[in-house]
Amino acid sequence: MIKLQKLKLYGFNNLTKSLSFCIYDICYANTNDSRNSYISYIDEQYNAIRLTKILKKTCSIIGANVLNIFHQDYEPQGASVTILVCEEPMSMEKIDALNKNIVSSSVLAHLDKSHICVHTYPESHPQSGICTFRADIEVSTCGIISPLNALNYLIHQLESDIVTIEYRVRGFTRDIHGIKHFIDHKINSIQNFMSDDIKSMYDMVDVNVYQENIFHTRMLLREFNLKNYLFNINLENLEKEERSYIKKLLSKEMREIYYGRNISR
């Protein structure tokens, strides 16, 4: 758990902390039917109900209280979940008042700043057989709640080939002497808050803007086992040349996503 510096604050902690994930799952399917089957499979694996369970557990880990949940599966594919959260428990009377358009100023502040959401994007290449699944997740909180406490849980739950993570702290809070504090904990890398087993699984690179309190980490899975990337294909049925071709194709796709640019070779 992240330990915040003990500052004597004047009023509410107005810092907004946002942790954003962009995760990718890659596979190879050599026919149109297989590609369609993969998209259907991954769409079911990451349906709105399962994603809601993951995000509710995230709320529990960071110590947030759920105000409202919206989830939706889409046709032909994709899902979205949004959870509005607050730092302190909210009485049922106040929550029910939202349905009558009676909203206090304190609740408005929470709804504006504290939320957890996820959106999914399955897709496939029209010719090569490459299929990708992307999920965008954002955990945004205000007050003493830190989204970094859910970092390892979310990485483990999503089991991705490529992950890009951004953590940023916005705004400021004042202490009792009126001095502004633009961040309330020590950090020089998102990797500071990752478990050792995650660090051993991924190659990682940081791009941080310290003066703006913006921290960015890219992650690429180290172990590559071709068998794990084939959908409805038996590895033993592939010739050596075909295995090599598919491996190069997948490697190129993963490197392009990891570096965020097209690679010619």
UniProtKB/Swiss-Prot annotation:
The record's catalysed reaction(s) read: S-adenosyl-L-methionine + H(+) = S-adenosyl 3-(methylsulfanyl)propylamine + CO2
The catalytic residues are: S114 (schiff-base intermediate with substrate), H119 (proton acceptor), C142 (proton donor)
UniProt site (Cleavage (non-hydrolytic)): K113, S114
Question: What cofactors does this protein use?
Answer: pyruvate
- Enzyme Commission number: 4.1.1.50
The annotation note on the cofactor reads: Binds 1 pyruvoyl group covalently per subunit.
State which pathway it belongs to: Amine and polyamine biosynthesis; S-adenosylmethioninamine biosynthesis; S-adenosylmethioninamine from S-adenosyl-L-methionine: step 1/1
* Classification via Pfam families: AdoMet_dc
Residues recorded as bearing Pyruvic acid (Ser) in the entry: S114
Function field: Catalyzes the decarboxylation of S-adenosylmethionine to S-adenosylmethioninamine (dcAdoMet), the propylamine donor required for the synthesis of the polyamines spermine and spermidine from the diamine putrescine.
Q: PANTHER family this protein is in?
A: S-ADENOSYLMETHIONINE DECARBOXYLASE PROENZYME
Q: Which named protein is this?
A: S-adenosylmethionine decarboxylase proenzyme
